[in-house]
Amino acid sequence: MRGIVTRIVLSTQKCLPSVNCTRRYYSKQKDISIVRQRLGRPGNHLKIGIVGMPNIGKSTLFQILTKTNLGNPANYPFATIDPVHAKAPVLDSQYELLCEIYQPKTRIPAQLTIYDTAGLTRNSSKGEGLGNAFLSNIRSVDALFQLVRAFPEAQVPHVEKSVDPVRDLQIIQEELLLKDAEFLESYLKKEGRSPKTCAKALDTARRALEVVLGKGRQISKAEWNDEQIPILNSLNLLTAKPVVYLVNMDQDDYLSDEQEALKGIKEWVEKNSFGDQVIPLSVLFEEQLFMLTPEEAAQECASLGKNSQLSEIICAGYSALNLIHYFTASEKIVQAWTIADGSKAPDAAGIIHSDFKKKFVAGEVIKFSDFEKYKSVDACKSVGKCKTKGKDYTVEPGDIIFWKIAR
């Protein structure tokens, strides 16, 4: 199967289609689904990092996405050294409707953990600049927002002395490929001498080395079988991580829908990172909206005929990590619970408390489309739209669930 190629829509939420390699196949003999392996660390507490060249707006975008204030980012390379992280709310129409109906005292949306990392430069894989530290930061995250600069600004110098988005994309990809090649060569040298190392692991590592070094391709864009993928996941290779490309455009070009700056970038992504999402934005425009009240920002967007891209960016990152969420709802609290797509009911319940998994009995599940139609739990129950599900149930995006656990 392909590593990370299948595009799917997760739900009726505002989250857009994104890259996901989990596929479900249905057995002809039994009414069960078989979930294929996917590249990436499995889990519910995954994180995404903003990466790119220095001086392209990474730290400013991070502060806007996470609503944090770390001071004005400096206009010189490596202003960010140690990675910082914060959570961004994943707001969607389902969550908003539940809050509108219940008017709860406490509201907790789904959240995406985002890391701001130092700028990557040419020869970082050889240790230049912040080289090794930067690449270690990338290794610690599970997906990438790759920000590329497409705006000219004399007061913000470019480390390569000129603005060329396609060149920057190529530099970053080459550095990540070289670092993966270095890691794989070291792994094969060390583990190849050990009689305890599985032959399949060595064969997979050799093929991965041929992919990144011989073919110059990302691990995520090669084909891998279900035996190879867990091995690759254990290696935590940089080019196995899903990527969402963000293009920081000149504000005037962005507001006027100027496509010239995007053309070369889209062509490069189509050729080198097929299937990955490209989202244009203006960090300067987003920063100006960030300084306004929500009402003022809405008026500004309406007058310009252009909306903020923050929600789309956050949802794209959430989706790239293969995350979904379900809801628990009452007059006291409406909360979205983040889980990995494909999670079974006991695992989803265990996100609330470990006892919910250990003492799992069942879950009463209402599909969001039914709740949206009937507007209350009692109304859904009266028409048979509240179903009792057992431990084999796969939780779906937007499910409203009431768990039953043993005493």
Curated annotation (Swiss-Prot):
GO cellular component: cytoplasm; mitochondrion
Entry keyword set: ATP-binding, GTP-binding, Nucleotide-binding
Residue stretches making up the OBG-type G domain: 46-301
Annotated disulfide bonds: none
InterPro entries noted in UniProt: ATPase_YchF/OLA1 (IPR004396), Beta-grasp_dom_sf (IPR012675), G_OBG (IPR031167), GTP-bd (IPR006073), P-loop_NTPase (IPR027417), TGS (IPR004095), TGS-like (IPR012676), TGS-like_dom_sf (IPR023192)
Keyword ATP-binding carried by entry: yes
Binding site for ATP: 55-60, 249
Protein name: Obg-like ATPase homolog
